[in-house]
A protein has these predicted regions:
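Repeated scaffold domains used in trafficking and secretory/extracellular systems
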Residues: 1, 31-41, 74-84, 122-134, ...
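Ankyrin-repeat and related helical/solenoid repeat scaffolds used for protein-protein interactions
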Residues: 167-199
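Surface-exposed loop/turn elements that mediate protein-protein interactions on large endomembrane-trafficking
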Residues: 12-29, 54-71, 98-122, 143-167, ...
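Short regulatory "switch" loops immediately downstream of catalytic or recognition motifs
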Residues: 47-48, 88-97, 158-163, 187
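Long, acidic/polar, low-complexity amphipathic helices and coiled-coil-like
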Residues: 1, 5-17, 22-26, 31-41
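Solenoidal tandem-repeat scaffolds enriched in leucines and small polar residues
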Residues: 37-38, 45-46, 52, 91
């Protein structure tokens, strides 16, 4: 008799209902939007962007309370995932000359919901996920590293992916995903095609396919 979460496109709100149909309720505020929330351990973590800012909030489904976790003076901040009580997010720190963006740096952070501790996970990594209980980060060239969830400031392994990541893509697109104990990532295929590789923890290719 657990909960199933579902987003109502008609009402533009997140809801949940009991598996036996005995209870139905809205989850949090209407500001929780489709594609911008993650659920773990009774917490719904989501982002709200408006007026040039991004706010990351947490709704506790048991206490029915909403707390603000982080606020940024940019809309270039994204939640990457919620893993237990660990929140992985990224922020693009843009460099400007006047009102013109001339460059910038992507930074990943790990936030502990229990302690409120925030860890900076280095610069210039454009993709990140939690994979096999470790933090996986990599740059566009495929230079990758693993960090411990318990001590994220320590890099436990550095290596290179067999292929560079897909080029000419929006910074908000996900190019790396953990799939069970395996890792899937997008690379350049032939012409305009995208090649998806699925690798295991020993970096052996399990399968690959192309999409247009």
């Amino acid at each position: 008799n657990g909960w199933i979460y579902s987003y109502s496109a008609k009402d533009d709100r997140l809801a949940r209902f009991r598996t036996d149909g005995s209870q139905y309720e809205w989850v949090g505020e209407a500001e929780i939007k489709s594609g911008r929330y993650y659920i773990s351990n009774g917490n719904v973590v989501y982002s709200v962007s408006n007026d040039g800012t991004t706010t990351i909030k947490c709704f506790n489904t048991e206490k029915k309370t909403t707390d603000t976790l982080k606020t940024f003076d940019t809309t270039s901040a994204w939640i990457n995932g919620l893993y237990g009580n660990h929140l992985l997010y990224e922020v693009y720190d843009a460099k400007k000359e006047g009102d013109v963006v001339t460059g910038g740096t992507m930074r990943f952070y790990l936030y502990n919901l229990n302690s409120g501790t925030d860890y900076t996970l280095g610069n210039d990594k454009i993709e990140g996920t939690v994979w096999n209980d470790q933090i996986f980060l990599c740059d566009k060239a495929g230079n990758a590293e693993l960090r411990s969830l318990q001590d994220p400031m320590i890099v436990t392994k550095e290596f290179k992916l067999p292929n560079a990541l897909l080029g000419n893509i929006s910074t908000s697109a996900r190019l790396v995903l953990a799939v069970g104990k395996n890792l899937a990532f997008a690379t350049d295929g032939e012409g305009s095609q995208v090649k998806i590789l699925l690798m295991n923890s020993e970096w052996k290719e399990l399968t690959s396919f192309t999409v247009n």
